[in-house]
């Protein structure tokens, strides 16, 4: 810290002991309930190359939300099959490259569904595709959602039937659906948010009789904050709800922490 105060430029000051403790806690908490659970570090939280390389060394995947972040992950040594590609800002070229090379790609729009038809047919059969689910979080957690009663900005709405149409599109074009992505932004980061996410995942799996490889519950957790839910609290709750559905007994989980694994360990 003393050396940091001597610098004549803004900088990040990283307490590696705190960051390591938070990362290890996240890993152990996920693996307690899903031995092969996937943890993707959210690049948008802080994409400082040292931090990304550190997360890679710890075994965390890259969670990216733009073509620039996708390219950064590759430049920093991530193999394409250890990247999770989310969000509506995917470029077409990077999207197709990701789909054809084993990246977990969570489809966010009808435009991306159409892009799938331009992918190599044989490679598409081996792809790992999820659908971003948009549901009314406010109905489950009044006063806790960022959007209130308005529709979220991302993904396919369950309530309007857009999700059903996306599922039908995949079935009609013989595109295998590997997963669902249900990240929700909230005001509270409460356990109720993840209870809702898990319950909606179960509801969709039952309604459409889906056999999925993964459910991506996103990020937004507290981390290293006293008197707030721990990683174990979140993941145990989700696991208990998933355990009520036989169709999910062989389904893996993806979590995407960002601030929860670095926030307490970084100063400026």
Task: Map each language-model feature to its residues.
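A charged N-terminal "starter" segment
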Residues: 1-127, 164, 168, 172-176, ...
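Flexible, glycine/proline-enriched loop segments at strand-loop-helix junctions
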Residues: 10, 101-107, 147-158, 186-192
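Short beta-strand segments
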Residues: 42, 128-134, 181-183, 216-218
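Metal-dependent enolase-superfamily TIM-barrel catalytic cores that perform enediolate-based chemistry
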Residues: 151-171, 187, 193-201
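Active-site-proximal loop/turn and secondary-structure-junction residues that shape catalytic pockets
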Residues: 45-47, 68-69, 89-91, 109-111, ...
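C-terminal active-site-proximal or functional interface alpha/beta core segments in diverse enzymes
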Residues: 186-268
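Short acidic, glycine/serine/threonine-rich loops at helix termini
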Residues: 52, 75, 95-97, 116-119, ...
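Phosphate/diphosphate-binding glycine-rich loops and adjacent basic-rich segments that engage nucleotide
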Residues: 131-158, 167
